[in-house]
């Protein structure tokens, strides 16, 4: 955070998009609107800026949404009027909300400008459950879990596919392959599974921004290069939908912080 503050002071503030976030619960207890507003103020103070572009209410579970909408949002909209942030956002908690239940409620309310959600090659259900509403209402989307441990940890993809095949959720022949997604690594396709994962998420209709984080600076340039590449071949996208479009809750665990992730 101190590095971010110094960085912001060295450039024109309107040349970058800055976001921050606050959780709405502490354990089983919901936070008050005053507490969340105080968190916003503290973030502004630490960053040395008088506003952020996006303020997110973070990891909101379905059972917290009504509290957020009725108690916290009105207070935050007053802070927005004061110029403390430009756009109001909300993020889901994928490990505990694989069906995007919270966001399906949020997409019915007019207060949200941006949402953050999970979407990846083996977790495609946002295509039906979230993106139609965000596209219709022009709500911005930030994609997380595009890579995470599922695609970045050696052997993890193969392990999960074997488990899913054993449960009857995937064909057994897929579990027998050394690289189950080898069809993506072809001429005109991707050079790596991580590259394919970023390109897949980036070019999904309804995606606006793909997030990535890493503990290794060497990952940054390849990640950006992957995101900037063209879509995967149409046949590959169709095959991913045929093989994995029915899956839910796969690859939504927290990552190894040293790994390449999003």
Regions found by a protein language model. Give the residues of each.
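Active-site phosphate/pyrophosphate- and oxyanion-stabilizing loops and adjacent acidic/basic residues
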Residues: 5-6, 41, 104, 199
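Alpha-helix-loop-beta-strand connector modules within alpha/beta enzyme cores
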Residues: 5-20, 73-83
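Structural beta-sheet core signal
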Residues: 18-20, 90, 143, 212
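Short, small-residue-biased leader/transition segments that mark boundaries at the very start
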Residues: 1-2
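Structured C-terminal cap/extension of enzyme domains
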Residues: 8, 109-110, 129-262
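Glycine/proline-rich, positively charged
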Residues: 24, 28-129, 139-142
């Amino acid at each position: 955070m101190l590095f971010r503050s110094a960085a912001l002071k060295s450039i024109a503030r309107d040349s970058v998009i800055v976001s921050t976030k606050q959780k709405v619960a502490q354990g089983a207890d919901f936070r008050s609107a005053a507490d969340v507003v105080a968190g916003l103020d503290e973030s502004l103070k630490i960053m040395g800026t008088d506003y952020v572009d996006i303020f997110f209410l973070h990891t909101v579970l379905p059972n917290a949404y009504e509290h957020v909408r009725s108690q916290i949002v009105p207070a935050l909209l007053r802070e927005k009027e004061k110029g403390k942030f430009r756009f109001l956002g909300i993020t889901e908690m994928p490990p505990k909300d694989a069906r995007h239940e919270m966001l399906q409620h949020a997409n019915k309310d007019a207060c949200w400008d941006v949402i953050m959600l999970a979407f990846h090659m083996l977790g495609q259900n946002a295509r039906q459950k979230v993106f139609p509403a965000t596209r219709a209402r022009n709500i911005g989307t930030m994609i997380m879990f595009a890579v995470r441990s599922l695609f970045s940890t050696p052997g993890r993809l193969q392990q999960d596919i074997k488990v899913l095949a054993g449960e009857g959720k995937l064909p057994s022949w897929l579990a027998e392959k050394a690289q189950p997604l080898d069809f993506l690594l072809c001429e005109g396709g991707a050079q790596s599974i991580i590259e394919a994962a970023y390109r897949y998420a980036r070019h999904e209709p309804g995606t606006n921004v793909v997030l990535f984080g890493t503990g290794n600076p060497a990952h940054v340039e390849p990640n950006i290069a992957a995101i900037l590449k063209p879509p995967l071949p149409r046949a590959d996208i169709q095959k991913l939908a045929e093989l994995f479009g029915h899956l839910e809750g796969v690859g939504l665990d927290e990552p190894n912080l040293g790994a390449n992730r999003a």
